């Protein structure tokens, strides 16, 4: 019988937890025996998820002030362009999936209204696009990108329910090839974008269960997925319950018609929650309303006063009016200063949405008024980018793999006369 997929024993799992530096400082509220019991008799090998998680962790845990910055991708092709341009990770936000990439096929606000497996579906699509780009590059002998399969950090939102929902969603993320996932401490049924009003927190202990469940799913899958805890306590004014004594200093005593308790928002509850989440999370993210380095510094110092090695994440959000808050020189050094504070993963959540919408609007605006010159201007800018910066998608047939599949065709039949690129307008006109 084959040994492929043989599950780890409880002893092997425990030894990994005890000796692997990857797990320094990580708490699990379950045992190695329980993980072994949940594995089944065959454990699938999640190559992309495991490889991506290792790359991501090595990058964010490296000593020094270096950081990884990423843009939110909405499509597979956007992710390919990001990697081609030099980025080392891809971010996938639930907001963008809600807005234009969910399995319901509708446009939604960021309120967890779409099918729960939509984000894993887009993770898979992005990985498929990156795999194809890698295959094309290998056939062409193109070594300009050293790693096409960069880590993907994906949005688990508030988990779409309780601990079991989180477990299943995390499994789906891993199967799709996500390297990291983040989970926010909002009530799933009332979940809102971090920059909307009406956010309702769950008790601290309940979110620890969320993080614990996400970690358990990764352990059962034998994948070192990077688990990121997000707190929305900086702006949230409601909480479901006063059951957790750690939350009580911030509860005002007033209640709403729905039975929720009012809480005091701000930095202090964020730090308190982050300290509670730290043993269960690889990284921590405080959602904020403005690009405020002083606030970020106070948060980092507050958390690291108790957990000095805690890694942090930061949302460089498009919901901020950056130029209204900061001068150009401050914007230029913003991420570098965050990196020095320990914010080792920084991302622009909705970059894909804004790039896609403005790019098409700008082209359509010109085309509606000028006709063909508007598109030709775009094409000429593509040619220039190809010549000066390594942009390749101006050759659109090549970009989607026509040459790669020609290689397959001629491998099967060396005398094939039906290859696609030979004799194409692209071959003749796009040199």
From Swiss-Prot:
Coiled coil: none annotated. The active site is at residue 193. Homotetramer. Substrate binds at residues 93-95, 194-195, 230, 315-319, 349. It catalyses: D-threo-isocitrate = glyoxylate + succinate. SUPFAM superfamilies: Phosphoenolpyruvate/pyruvate domain. Its cofactor is Mg(2+). One of its GO terms (biological process) is tricarboxylic acid cycle. It comes from Corynebacterium efficiens (strain DSM 44549 / YS-314 / AJ 12310 / JCM 11189 / NBRC 100395). Residues 1-21 are annotated as: Disordered. Its EC number is 4.1.3.1. The lineage of its organism: Bacteria, Bacillati, Actinomycetota, Actinomycetes, Mycobacteriales. GO terms for molecular function: isocitrate lyase activity; metal ion binding. This is Isocitrate lyase. Mg(2+) binds at residue 155. Involved in the metabolic adaptation in response to environmental changes. Catalyzes the reversible formation of succinate and glyoxylate from isocitrate, a key step of the glyoxylate cycle, which operates as an anaplerotic route for replenishing the tricarboxylic acid cycle during growth on fatty acid substrates. Keywords: Glyoxylate bypass, Lyase, Magnesium, Metal-binding, Tricarboxylic acid cycle. Pfam families: ICL. Belongs to the isocitrate lyase/PEP mutase superfamily. Isocitrate lyase family. InterPro entries: ICL/PEPM, Isocitrate_lyase, Isocitrate_lyase_ph_CS, Pyrv/PenolPyrv_kinase-like_dom, Pyrv_kinase-like_dom_sf. Pathway: Carbohydrate metabolism; glyoxylate cycle; (S)-malate from isocitrate: step 1/2.
């Amino acid at each position: 019988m084959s040994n492929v997929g043989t599950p780890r024993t409880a002893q092997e799992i425990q030894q990994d937890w005890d000796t692997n530096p990857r797990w320094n400082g990580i708490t699990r509220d379950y045992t190695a025996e329980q993980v072994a019991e949940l594995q089944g008799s065959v454990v699938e090998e999640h190559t992309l998820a495991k490889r991506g998680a290792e790359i991501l962790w090595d990058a964010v845990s490296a000593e020094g002030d270096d950081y990884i910055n990423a843009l939110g991708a909405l499509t597979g092709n956007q992710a390919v362009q990001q990697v081609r341009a030099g980025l080392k990770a891809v971010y996938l936000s639930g907001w963008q999936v809600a807005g234009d990439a969910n399995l319901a096929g509708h446009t939604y606000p960021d309120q967890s209204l779409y099918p729960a497996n939509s984000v894993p579906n887009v993770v898979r699509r992005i990985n498929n696009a990156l795999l194809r780009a890698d295959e094309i590059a290998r056939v062409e002998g193109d070594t300009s990108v050293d790693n096409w399969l960069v880590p993907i950090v994906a949005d688990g939102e508030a988990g779409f329910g309780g601990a079991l929902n989180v477990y299943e969603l995390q499994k789906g993320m891993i199967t799709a090839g996500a390297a990291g996932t983040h989970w926010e401490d909002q009530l799933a049924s009332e979940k809102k974008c971090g920059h909307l009003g009406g956010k309702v927190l769950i008790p601290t202990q309940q979110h620890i269960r969320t993080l614990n469940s996400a970690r358990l799913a990764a352990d059962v899958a034998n994948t070192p997925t990077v688990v990121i805890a997000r707190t929305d306590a900086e702006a949230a004014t409601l909480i479901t319950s006063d059951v957790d004594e750690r939350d009580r200093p911030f509860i005002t005593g007033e209640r709403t018609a729905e039975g929720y308790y009012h809480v005091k928002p701000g930095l202090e509850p964020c730090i308190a929650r982050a300290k509670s989440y730290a043993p269960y999370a690889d990284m921590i993210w405080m959602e904020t309303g403005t690009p405020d380095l002083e606030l970020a510094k106070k948060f980092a110092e507050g958390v690291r006063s108790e957990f000095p090695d805690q890694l942090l994440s930061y949302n460089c959000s498009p919901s901020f009016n950056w130029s209204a808050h900061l001068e150009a020189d401050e914007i230029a050094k913003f991420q570098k200063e965050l990196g020095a504070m320990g914010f080792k993963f920084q991302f622009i959540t909705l970059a894909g949405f804004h790039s896609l919408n403005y790019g098409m609007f700008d082209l359509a605006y010109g085309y509606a008024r000028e006709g063909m010159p508007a598109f030709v201007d775009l094409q000429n800018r593509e040619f220039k980018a190809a010549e000066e910066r390594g942009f390749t998608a101006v050759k659109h047939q090549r970009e989607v793999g026509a040459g790669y599949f020609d290689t397959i065709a001629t491998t099967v039949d060396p005398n094939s006369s039906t290859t696609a690129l030979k004799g194409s307008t692209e071959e003749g006109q796009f040199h």
